[in-house]
Amino acid sequence: MAVISMKQLLECGVHFGHQTRRWNPKMAKYIFTERNGIHVIDLQQTVKLADQAYEFVRDAAANDAVILFVGTKKQAAEAVADEATRAGQYFINHRWLGGTLTNWGTIQKRIARLKEIKRMEEEGTFDVLPKKEVALLNKQRARLEKFLGGIEDMPRIPDVMYVVDPHKEQIAVKEAKKLGIPVVAMVDTNADPDDIDIIIPANDDAIRAVKLITAKLADAIIEGRQGEDADIAFEADTQADSIEEIVEVVEGDNA
């Protein structure tokens, strides 16, 4: 049984790609048709590739892989943080800092500074410092938490990276590829899929679509870690939907 049903994908709008003029021709094989100037993603492939992504992430988690979720666009930020946390993994959901992976030593120093500031507050150091200095420390902590809070406890460079919108996260993807880190990604019709190891063709601009796919990969991690079925966020629907039904839905939505 597929980990995500066609019905779920349709309900969350996963099939809607970008305007045809914004497409990347390399995504042609994942496009089913075009309706009213919008590319429609072939959800039969999405179902199959989501299964592959699930199995890959589950098996990686079973081998204690460190998995980093990346999604800095506003539609992805909340789901990326929530689902990575639920799965006991790590995330970056604000701006990707260049060198986060390729200059990991420097990033670790910034994380150490964040932990130091937190420790100063916990130990009461803030109580004896001038208010102006405390304000500066709080400002520094807030900035560090914003960009690095999701990887504060990441023990090492990740073994796998999951990305929402590799078109936007090109720097992150390039760093991962440079280090040989496999990338699983939601890839829309405007993106270049070449650097992605496991492609999930999907609308990466709809919050519900991002939540559906991201939650399913979090389920995969939980299952891999527990060695049993996860308490899944989205129940699989066994009802099969034909490709013709997809067209009917798309035409209805674009009418």
From Swiss-Prot:
Keywords: Ribonucleoprotein, Ribosomal protein. The keyword Heme does not apply. The keyword Ribonucleoprotein applies. Pfam families: Ribosomal_S2. One of its GO terms (molecular function) is structural constituent of ribosome. CDD domains: RPS2. GO terms for cellular component: cytosolic small ribosomal subunit. One of its GO terms (biological process) is translation. It comes from the Bacteria. Belongs to the universal ribosomal protein uS2 family. HAMAP family: Ribosomal_uS2_B. This is Small ribosomal subunit protein uS2. It comes from Streptococcus pyogenes serotype M49 (strain NZ131). The gene is rpsB.
